Amino acid sequence: NGSISLLITGDEEGDAVNGTKKVVDYLKKKRENINFCLVGEPTNPNRLGEMIKIGRRGSLTGKLTIHGLQGHVAYPHRAKNPSTIIVEILKKFKDIKFDKGTKDFQPTNLEITKINIDNTADNVIPAIAQATFNIRFNNKHSSTSLKKRLNKILKRISKKHKSKFKVEYRVSGEAFLTKPDKTTFMIQSVIKKITKIRPKLSTTGGTSDLRFIKAICPGLEFGLVGKTMHKVDEAVSLKDLKNLTKIYLNIIQNYFK
């Protein structure tokens, strides 16, 4: 009734340029017709069976540099302090009320992750100030619309202070949502049958490789418990591993009925 392909990637974290993304590009060129994808992300917070991911928020990172004019703190009129300017900009960014969330997604949120003013002297106004921020956004926005909004603020404040700025953006993925259908409900039923838990449909958490796969087919995410992921002594339960194997087998059998 069909065929199955298994993709294992060794480049899933960070920029993820040499893994799933390149396979998806290859499949597009080959015009391979794929109907569905199940991604084995650790979707469950505490117990196997708690959660299926039906979408993910987008992720936009920005690295901002403000160029000022170095000088002595006793003579501020002879300098231009980029620290003051970057603080004003970051406050404006944090004050943005992007949205209130949707039925499927949490509200869009911006977090400042780095502030760097490379200045070892206490009595010198620095020449450069830098900051990094990240936005996790829902499907009310695109990375393009968010960049336009932020750039307006940057231009306005820089013009006011007669300063120069540089901003570098990196998009890890756009927000996406797989609308629940008969395949979703079948997977829910299989999980409940084996774990005795009916999984919640969720879009919480970070990005995943489904952000690439969604370009060629719909998909969901379901895997192990992620309680210890990215921690020292990361581990999973052997019982969970056996039950997940049963779940995957049942899903395949039901899908090809």
Regions found by a protein language model. Give the residues of each.
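Acidic/histidine-rich catalytic neighborhood of metal-dependent amide-processing enzymes
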Residues: 1-55
